[in-house]
Amino acid sequence: KEIAAKAAGEETCQGWMEAAPSVGFTVWDHSDRRTIYLLNTDWASDQDQRPATFIYKGKKFPVVVRRYHIETIHCADGLAVMPASNTTDILSVCKRENGWVIKVQTTGNDVVQCMNAVTGKVEPIKFDEPGVHEVFVNE
């Protein structure tokens, strides 16, 4: 148990999940970011969603994991981005002097949650039409 806790502790600086009942996750490391895939495994109850806690660089963020969805969290350079839609793609997250430029491709309306590991704040960004969008998120 101690070995597992130590290994998990080392991962939180790149983005990790606290253990939660009925929420499974896996991690994929790309050359420029980490993507966490979350799955609500509670198919027996009448609960449509389960709470979980995302940890990034010492900050903790509550997230909701919906039934029948694979949720994703993309982590890069101190910013984590979680789209609401399964068809939204986070194309890039690039650190700049006072924040990040994120490039997002949507197939319709969507909201992405930007979780700032520097300040601990969460900022939702709303997209009102499909396409490729580039937005700046302040540090």
Where are these regions (language model features)?
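Non-catalytic C-terminal accessory domains or segments of carbohydrate-active enzymes
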Residues: 1-139
